[in-house]
Amino acid sequence: MSLANRLSHLNITGGNDFKASIGPSVGRQNEATNPWSSTSHSLENSAATVVNELQTTKEQKTPEQSTTANPLFPGNDFSDFNNHKSKLLGVITGKSTPSSQAEKSDTTNSKTGSTEELTETPADENAKQYMLESLLPIIRMEDSEMSTLQLGCDLAALGFDLAPVEEDRLISTNLFSPWAELNTKKPVSQPMFKLPACYKNVNPPPAISKIFQFSDETLFYIFYTMPRDVMQEAAAQELTNRNWRFHKELRVWLTPVPGMKPLQRTPQFERGYYMFFDPIHWKRIKKDFLLMYAALEDRAQSAVHS
C-alpha cells in the first residue's frame, strides 16, 4: 500500500481536519487535556501538505511517465519485485518459474542468433569422456564389452564353482584360465620352424667325463685359467696321468724327453733333458736340467673322477 493510500485511509486530506473525523467532542477534549496540541496541529498540516503534493504530482503524470521504471521500487504494483522474488525461489528450490523461463528465452534470443546455432568444439567433445556423464553408459551396461572391461566379469557366469570347500583353497588351483578348453584344440597355423636335435638332449654328460679326450694344451689352459675350480684339479690329475709333473718352485709343468735316459740319477735328484711348458709364451721348451725330487708336487697317478 502506498503512502497516499495509507494517509487517505486515515481520512487525512488537504481540506479536512483530523479532529473532525474523530468527532467534535473528542477533539475538544484532546485540546483541553493534551499539552502538545499545538505541535499536533502543525504535524497535521504538514501531512496534509505532503498528501496534496503527491496527489497533484500523480494527476500531472502522463501514462507514459507512470509506467517509467523506478530504480528503487520498479513498477507501481511491485511486479518486478515479485519477479525477482520468484527467481530467488527458483534458484533455491531448483524449480524454474514461468517468469524465469521467459527471461531465459529472451536472453538467449538477444545474443547472436539462437542457441541452436552454437556448436561444440572438438576440445569439449574430448573432455566429456573424462566427466561423470561418461560413467552413465558403463553403469547402465549399454555396451557389454566396455562394461566387462570396466566392471569385470562374474566368475559364476563362467561355470566356475565358487562354493568354499576348504578355507584356504585358492581359486588359482582350480581355475587355470577361462578359455582352458581352447588349449585342447590344435593351433590354427603351425609354426614354420624345426627344432634342432641338440635342443632335445636332456641332461647331457658333464664336461669332466670327457677330459681324457682333451689335448695337453687344452689341459694347460684349464689349469691356468680356472684357479681353485674342480676343473683345475681334474686337468692337473690328467696331466699327471700323462707323465707331466708340476714344479712347485718354478710353477711350470715338465716331463722327460721321450727316448732319452737321465744322465745322472741319485735318491735326491736326477739330471737329464726335460720338456718344459712355458705358460707366458705358450710353447714347449727343451732344457738340460737338474731336477730335485723334493721340488715336485707329490701326486700319484689315478683316474679322474667326475
Swiss-Prot record:
Compositional bias segments (type: Polar residues): 27-44, 94-116
Predominant location category: cytoplasm
Transcription regulation is among the record's keywords: yes
Disordered: annotated segments: 1-44, 56-79, 94-126
GO annotation, biological process: nuclear-transcribed mRNA poly(A) tail shortening; regulation of DNA-templated transcription
GO cellular component assignments: CCR4-NOT complex; CCR4-NOT core complex; cytosol; nucleus; P-body
Official protein name in the record: General negative regulator of transcription subunit 2
Originating species: Schizosaccharomyces pombe (strain 972 / ATCC 24843) (Fission yeast)
